Curated annotation (Swiss-Prot):
Keyword match Lyase: yes
Residues bound to N(6)-(1,2-dicarboxyethyl)-AMP: 15-16, 90-92, 122-123, 247, 296, 301-303, 309, 335, 340-344
Gene3D superfamilies documented for this protein: Fumarase/aspartase (C-terminal domain), Fumarase/aspartase (Central domain), Fumarase/aspartase (N-terminal domain)
Official protein name in the record: Adenylosuccinate lyase
Gene: purB
Catalytic activity: N(6)-(1,2-dicarboxyethyl)-AMP = fumarate + AMP; (2S)-2-[5-amino-1-(5-phospho-beta-D-ribosyl)imidazole-4-carboxamido]succinate = 5-amino-1-(5-phospho-beta-D-ribosyl)imidazole-4-carboxamide + fumarate
Enzyme class: lyase
Amino acid sequence: MELTSLTAISPVDGRYSNLTILLRNIFSEFGFLKYRLNIEVQWLKKIISMSQILDINNIEYKEILFLDSIVEEFNEKDAILIKNIEKETNHDIKALEYFLKNKIAQSKNLLTISEFVHFGCTSEDINNIAYSLMIKDARDKIILPLWYKIISTLKKMVFKYQHYPLLSLTHGQPATPSTMGKEIANFYYRMKRQYIILKKIEILGKINGSTGNYNAHLAAYPDINWHKISKDFITSFGINWNPYTTQIEPHDYIAEFFSCMSLFNTILINFNRDMWGYISLNYFKQRTIDYEIGSSIMPHKVNPIDFENSEGNLGLSNALMNHMITKLPISRWQRDLSDSTVLRNIGVAISYAIIAYNSVLSGINKLEINESELLKNLDKNWSILSEPIQTIMRRYGIKNAYEKLKKLTRGKEINRNVIHTFISSLNIPEEEKKRLKNMTPFNYIGAASQIINEIE
């Protein structure tokens, strides 16, 4: 059976393939091979650049261009050839090394230095840099732009709904009012913090041999400062150098990276659930699309499927990421292979998140505020004014203020008349009575509408 979006086992490459297609060039087997091939080529070029020390003097500029073309022109036919070599070697990096050696054999001058391909390297020297660059590209080209889009969309919602009063619910029960804009601002601020953190996370790489000590390098060329060469090579990719490792780069930065992503995802799950709840309360309506169907049997249904889809995929993403957070920083002694299969699922974890990000944006785009329902719910809950009344009573030294309001309001149907009658009975200045009577569930919103003007 040919592999298509219909025959793929994973919905990442099946049902949701249109949402994850940009990740294929990065996290597919083809992508992984190309990243690793590039590192092998760049390492060979680095060796060539040390020609005066290593006595390599016959490599011309055209050969350097040829090496670059091997990466630039890398295609599926090349990838299949590497996989066929791997069937014999049962070792992916060795297969890649043999492929590159076969390629450079086309050049007489490069053929003379073919044994400098993969010189001094352990497989992890190549793999760890590849993963670093894959994560960097995914972050800079896909994840952060989507986060920015979500955050920017929330910011627009903040000011669009700045003056829409909202009955707050603590423990699911009526509480001091806010505004819809302020409640969205809470999520905006939380997500923006994670955006800034993710952008600044240092992505690390290493190239220092089998156990991190340049043993083979120094055996061949003891007078060369391989530590400095390692640093120069790693930083040339725009990533940070880890000078102290075992055979593997310890993956702490991946744990940091996914900790940030997982927290952003968790905040977004919180947002999805709140939006789901507001839709359920009829605070938001969803724009309908004529040809869409909400239920196979209930024709009237318009379900919040985008927020539900987003929540579900974020859960899957976090499950994988949280496993990686606790698994990847641990390796037995100088290394064990249990991280290898886990690392190959980095793209899967990110893919579920990307699906979720697109879903939440789709859901937000369908929302329409239902102001009448917001006001209707507020009007049913005049008892929330017990908070400002008892607070002002305390200001004027009235004893048992809290207890008196508790007796008046708790578990009872309270309306405007009941509240105003109670206010009239208070021994406080008439101006304060007037101010209290001007308070309603609709305008008792504190500074909710003002403080959001300070968001950046």
